[in-house]
């Protein structure tokens, strides 16, 4: 299923996050939906690069979800999703997207 009328998702803060290598960063998005079967996705895009999958998790799932790298963990609630990046590296410098499906 795709985005349904009335569904929305947006970053909690549109900002640049500045951190040091090896630290932990948390990014979050708030969403609303009328669907009971929702998956929340995280992607990143390097400057002039393709968008790459990072993680997804069912909105109402207690399982860990799927990630492309174990440094990335996604958590969800009924109104938000959070991406935690541990052991931050210089190569994590990118634009991050959250998506609802």
Identify the residue ranges that each predicted region occupies:
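Extracellular domains of the immunoglobulin superfamily
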Residues: 1-101
């Amino acid at each position: 299923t795709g985005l349904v009328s009335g569904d929305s998702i947006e970053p909690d803060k549109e900002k640049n996050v500045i951190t040091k290598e090896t630290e932990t960063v948390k990014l979050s998005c708030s969403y609303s939906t009328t669907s009971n079967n929702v998956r929340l996705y995280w992607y990143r895009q390097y400057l002039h690069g393709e968008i790459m999958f990072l993680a997804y998790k069912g909105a109402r799932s207690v399982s860990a979800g799927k990630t492309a790298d174990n440094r990335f963990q996604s958590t969800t609630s009924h109104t938000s999703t959070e991406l935690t990046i541990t052991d931050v590296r210089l190569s994590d410098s990118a634009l991050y997207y959250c998506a609802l499906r």
